[in-house]
């Protein structure tokens, strides 16, 4: 009985949050990568970082279109490493909006879409 009440309450919350409509489909990774690049949202990471590798896999082939700064190769990419120091990057991955707002850790495509201000209409 308690489980049935709990499930009913959770369903009501879900309907209230989502407005009773179908959940929005995940954004197109390529379109999102292009949007992030065009709006100057920067992605800081390291080639050694498992979380960064996972973040990249979420974008699939579009990962090459991301505005990425490599923080883990200071000898090979000193300008990028200096940018990481200037932005005080302490965790990977780190995403930074042009206004300085940041998110650390792996972000879902949906969260990046909303956070970056990308239109959610297909």
Question: What is each PLM-predicted segment?
Answer:
Residues 27-67:
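Local sequence-structure signature of Cys/Sec-based thiol-disulfide redox active-site neighborhoods
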Residues 84-96:
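Structural micro-motif
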Residues 74-83:
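Structural microenvironment flanking redox-active thiols in thiol-disulfide oxidoreductases
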Residues 22-25:
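Boundary at the C-terminal end of the N-terminal hydrophobic targeting segment
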Residues 47-51, 72-74, 90-91, 100-103:
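Solvent-exposed loop/turn segments at secondary-structure junctions
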Residues 1-6:
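Bacterial N-terminal signal peptides that target proteins for export
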Residues 8-16:
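Bacterial N-terminal signal peptides
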Residues 96-122:
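Non-catalytic, surface beta->alpha helical segment in thiol-disulfide oxidoreductase systems
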